[in-house]
Amino acid sequence: MSVTQYYGTGRRKTSTARVFIKAGSGVITVNDRPLDEYFGRPVARMVVRQPLELVDLVEKFDVNVTVSGGGSFGQAGAIRHGLTRALMEYDENLRSELRKAGYVTRDSREVERKKVGLRKARKRPQYSKR
């Protein structure tokens, strides 16, 4: 007996998350650890739960996530994006609601590369007139 599960890939900065959701009681597991243990900051945990809370499906699905790369907030954003895609695979009618909240769009902001002759991406060395 196979349980129907839905999949979504999410990305944010350098993080990539593979999100699997299946009918359950609302348990969220990230890299084989509970959500509260994996993310220390409450804000990161809140970001992950946002799509489920928006569509009132928090207690309906068990979420299993594999995430790699980036920092904690990048990973949280990637999980949110993947979870949104998985929910849309489950029910396409949720798309408009999730789109309105801004969860469907991939946040394309990436770190700007460092340029030759500059200290960082845009910071120039101090200018000396004389």
Curated annotation (Swiss-Prot):
GO terms under biological process: translation
Which Pfam families does the entry link to? Ribosomal_S9 (PF00380)
Q: Which HAMAP family match?
A: Ribosomal_uS9_B
Note the superkingdom of the native organism: Bacteria
Give the residue ranges for region: Disordered.
Answer: 108-130
| Family as reported in the entry's similarity comment | Belongs to the universal ribosomal protein uS9 family.
Swiss-Prot/TrEMBL keywords:
Ribonucleoprotein, Ribosomal protein
Question: What is the recorded name of this protein?
Answer: Small ribosomal subunit protein uS9
> SUPFAM superfamilies this protein is in?
Ribosomal protein S5 domain 2-like
**InterPro entries registered for this protein in UniProt:** Ribosomal_Su5_D2-typ_SF, Ribosomal_uS9, Ribosomal_uS9_bac/plastid, Ribosomal_uS9_CS, Ribsml_uS5_D2-typ_fold_subgr
Please give the GO cellular component terms listed in this UniProt entry.
Answer: cytosolic small ribosomal subunit
Here the segments flagged for biased composition (Basic residues) are 116-130
Q: Name one GO molecular function term.
A: RNA binding
